[in-house]
């Protein structure tokens, strides 16, 4: 808060003490509490929740900014931990929806959660496998995966049920294909 106090003084010629800022933040937190409860309830009862976390510094200490978001709301939380308990607390013990995330174990270890992995992370992983192995089949897998995701986005926007079903069939075929069985990393990605 000392830095914020200096910014107000330097940039806006407004004098506010660090303790004054702390009091302001506490009042704002109290006012926002009902909205936070409403957002938590919405997230915990949603059918699909995207989750992610990123490293930040808090008072010089390593911390994580956590995000649980739906199409209508975003719930943020700062913790000094990257442990699975944070995700569990954010979603609540009775969460029954789908968690869309990267491959981090805090999300995948919850057996009762259904998982929908983030398309960008999945494509990035497939691309990395193709680059590292240099195998033509790994490249082919990555290209097909990208194509299916692109087609899936178009089908989702169009709302056409037949198009979405076609994309599902293509994905099922790619996931079930044994053509890539000589590539353990591709096989691992297929199982996800």
What are these regions (language model features)?
Residues 1-192:
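Catalytic center-proximal scaffold of phosphoryl-transfer enzymes
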């Amino acid at each position: 808060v000392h830095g914020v106090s200096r910014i107000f003084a330097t940039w806006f010629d407004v004098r506010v003490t660090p303790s004054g800022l702390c009091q302001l933040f506490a009042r704002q937190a109290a006012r926002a509490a009902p909205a936070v409860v409403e957002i938590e309830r919405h997230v915990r009862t949603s059918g699909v929740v995207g989750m992610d976390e990123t490293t930040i510094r808090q008072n010089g200490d390593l911390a994580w900014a956590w995000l649980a978001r739906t199409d209508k709301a975003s719930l943020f939380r700062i913790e000094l931990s990257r442990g699975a308990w944070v995700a569990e607390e954010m979603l609540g013990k009775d969460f029954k929806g789908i968690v869309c995330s990267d491959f981090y174990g805090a999300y995948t270890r919850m057996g009762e959660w259904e998982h929908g992995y983030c398309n960008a992370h999945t494509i990035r992983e497939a691309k990395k496998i193709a680059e590292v192995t240099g195998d033509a089949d790994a490249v082919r897998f990555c290209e097909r995966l990208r194509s299916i995701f692109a087609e899936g986005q178009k089908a989702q926007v169009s709302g056409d049920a037949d198009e979405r079903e076609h994309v599902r069939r293509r994905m099922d075929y790619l996931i079930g294909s044994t053509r890539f069985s000589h590539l353990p990393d591709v096989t691992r990605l297929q199982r996800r």
